[in-house]
Amino acid sequence: MSFLSFLLGQKKTSAVVAKERLQIILAHERSGRGASPDYLPQLQQELVAVISKYVNINPDDIKVHLERQDTLEVLEVKIEMPQKEA
């Protein structure tokens, strides 16, 4: 039925969207907040690949850091851009 809804262009109700978001949050919470983020090195490599398409950068100029404080997680990405030539 959802495939038919997709073809007909029916929009999801706000209840369905909220349910999907809650499921994502619960899955994240259940996966273990204390576990080390093993996806950060791959994320950094992919960021280097994407940014390198547009700007010539050194891979060491991109830093990815995950910080946890109580119930809040902050993903910080620092990108040092090359100086623009005059």
From Swiss-Prot:
Pfam families assigned to the protein according to its UniProt record, in alphabetical order: MinE
Keyword Phosphoprotein: no
A Gene Ontology BP annotation from the UniProt entry: cell division
TM regions (residue ranges): none
Record's keyword terms, sorted: Cell cycle, Cell division
Cysteine disulfide links: none
Keyword Cell cycle: yes
Family: Belongs to the MinE family.
Functional description taken from the UniProt entry: Prevents the cell division inhibition by proteins MinC and MinD at internal division sites while permitting inhibition at polar sites. This ensures cell division at the proper site by restricting the formation of a division septum at the midpoint of the long axis of the cell.
Protein name: Cell division topological specificity factor
